Amino acid sequence: MAHKKGQGSTQNNRDSAGRRLGVKKFGGEFVRAGNIIIRQRGTKVHPGNNVGLGKDHTIFALIDGVVKFERYGKDRQKVSVYPVE
């Protein structure tokens, strides 16, 4: 066994902090305009009605209302916000 670590092993053992991605408001929840609904990398979930898409693919509410997740196409998902009647 080596009695010195060697160059490779001393450079490993680092990791980055988690990015706190995921769904922040679930289906059926009430949101206000500007609330973040999903933080994601790429458009895993696509924007539907009354939601905006940020430059980092964050989906956020444009109006006050209720969140609804919907399927469209064969294998895509979208999220919309509908006003409360």
From Swiss-Prot:
Protein's GO biological process: translation
Cellular component annotations (GO), alphabetically ordered: cytosolic large ribosomal subunit
Superkingdom per UniProt: Bacteria
Pfam families: Ribosomal_L27
Sequence segments annotated as region (Disordered): 1-21
Keyword RNA-binding: no
GO-annotated molecular function: structural constituent of ribosome
Keyword set, alphabetical order: Ribonucleoprotein, Ribosomal protein
Cited PANTHER family: LARGE RIBOSOMAL SUBUNIT PROTEIN BL27M, RIBOSOMAL PROTEIN L27
Family note: Belongs to the bacterial ribosomal protein bL27 family.
NCBIfam families for this protein: L27
Protein name: Large ribosomal subunit protein bL27
Species this protein is from: Nitratiruptor sp. (strain SB155-2)
